[in-house]
């Protein structure tokens, strides 16, 4: 699935295993946490990863699975530092919504991550609840968007 308009130079599509090195190259967290690479490789191998391309280069990626109480769930959205604040994350969340097989799509972030909270609100997600004790002193806020 490729998604692009004439006015928007960002292309979104399903990531392939061969895309993983370029995806990890744009992910600053992955540079210092090797386990991120394992997570991304596994997701790409299962077809659970979408990427955004700008001018042929990976601008970001999103993971999507359907194992959160059998609903779609986005556990990770990554945008290259050079592409941040340009709508890439919104495009990735929209692509995840289009690829989601369920009527609800969930995601989450730490209470301390104000940028992610603004992103999710801007993408149409609403607060659904929270989970304590994942990161002590920093509750995980759960969000949902109703797709159908």
Residue locations for each model-derived region?
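Acetyl-CoA-dependent GNAT
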Residues: 5-6, 10, 14-76, 80, ...
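Short acidic/polar active-site loop segments enriched in Thr and Asp
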Residues: 70, 103, 126
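A short, internal acetyl-CoA/4′-phosphopantetheine-binding micro-motif in the GNAT/acyltransferase core
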Residues: 76-84, 109-110
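Conserved acetyl-CoA-binding loop-helix of GNAT-fold acetyltransferases
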Residues: 79, 85-98, 118-122
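Conserved GNAT acetyl-CoA-binding A-motif
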Residues: 99-111
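Conserved catalytic-core motifs of GNAT/GCN5-like acyltransferases
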Residues: 106-109, 126-142
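Conserved N-terminal glycine/acidic-rich loop preference
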Residues: 114-127, 132
């Amino acid at each position: 699935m490729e998604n692009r308009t004439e006015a928007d130079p960002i292309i979104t599509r399903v990531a392939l295993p061969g895309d993983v090195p370029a995806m990890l190259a744009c992910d600053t967290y992955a540079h210092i946490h090797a386990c991120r690479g394992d997570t991304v490789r596994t997701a790409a191998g299962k077809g659970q990863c979408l990427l955004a391309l700008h001018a042929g280069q990976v601008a970001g990626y999103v993971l999507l699975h359907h194992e959160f109480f059998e609903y779609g769930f986005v556990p990770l959205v990554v945008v290259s530092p050079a592409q941040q604040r340009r709508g890439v994350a919104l495009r990735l969340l929209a692509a995840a919504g289009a690829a989601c097989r369920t009527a609800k799509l969930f995601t989450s972030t730490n209470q301390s991550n104000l940028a992610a909270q603004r992103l999710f609100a801007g993408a149409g997600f609403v607060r659904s609840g929270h989970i304590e004790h994942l990161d002590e002193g920093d509750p995980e806020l759960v969000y949902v968007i109703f797709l159908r």
